[in-house]
Each structure stands twice: as structure tokens, then as C-alpha cells.
Amino acid sequence: MVAVCAIAGSAALRAQQAADVPAGDAARGRTLVESNQCFDCHRIADRGSRLGPNLSDIGSRRTPDRLRQALVAPDEEVAPENRFVRLVTKQGATITGRLLNQDSFSVQLITPKDELKTYMRAALREFAIVDKGLMPTVEGKLTDQQIADIVAYLASLKATSTGASY
């Protein structure tokens, strides 16, 4: 009986939290994405950088709840393919970027300048996966309505026949 009440209580809490989230407007969300530096890291269709995850079909891959969570707490769940690395060369130069590929001999990444770079492991003094991503939280910077609008826009981005990977 206690377990049933706890389950019912948590379901009621989730329903209340969902009711507290305003309905989003995808058109306003698109305007917000276009005006808030999202394209500095993300790509949608043929626009933007490849530094961060491609959002062209994000609505096919993530629920609205997960999209909202990624906006307000981006470091809570970073997919392995979106992790950043820090390389230090034997000459002391530090390079950061999103890891694309690695093998026993080389490391390939996309730099913040959207450049594809390959480094030989023999030329590196250090190779480290960065604990946090570059994505800033929008919490406290955007209103709940603006966040809901962005979520509505991102949720509307579905896969196309031409594909949308990378």
C-alpha cells in the first residue's frame, strides 16, 4: 500500500511539473536559436559549426524533456561522441576540441574554429577527456517561456530524406 501511494505521489509530482512548463512556440524558438550564438557550436541543416552536436534531426533523437534538460543542465548527460578533449603537444601547445576519431597512432578532432585537425600520438605529451562540455546553461539567462520555445523548435527538427549526421 505504501509503495502504491509513493508511485502515485511521484506520478502526481511529475504531472504537476509538466503542467508548470509553459507551452512552447517553435517559430519563437527558431528566432531564439538564431540570435543566441547556438550556431557558434551547433549545426542545423547547412548552417552553423560542427564543434557541437548536429541538431538537424534532434527532435527524432530526443524527447522534449531531454531537450529541456540539455538546455538547463548540459553537463549532466554528455554523449561520448560529444566529449571534448585537451591535447598538449611535446612543444607545450594546448589544443581543445571535440574528439572525432582516435586509434593507436593518431587523434582527430574538430577545433573551436571548426577545423578538422589530426595529431600524431607520438607528438603529444598529454591527452585528456574534459569533464565538462562547452555548452552553457540557459537557466537564469532565458525565461521559462523562452526555454519552452527553444524546446518546441528543437523537437520539431526531424530526420530528412537526405540524412543529418555528423
Question: What label would you give each PLM region?
Answer:
Residues 114-115, 119-134:
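Structured surface patches comprising rigid loops and adjacent beta-strands/short helices at the edges
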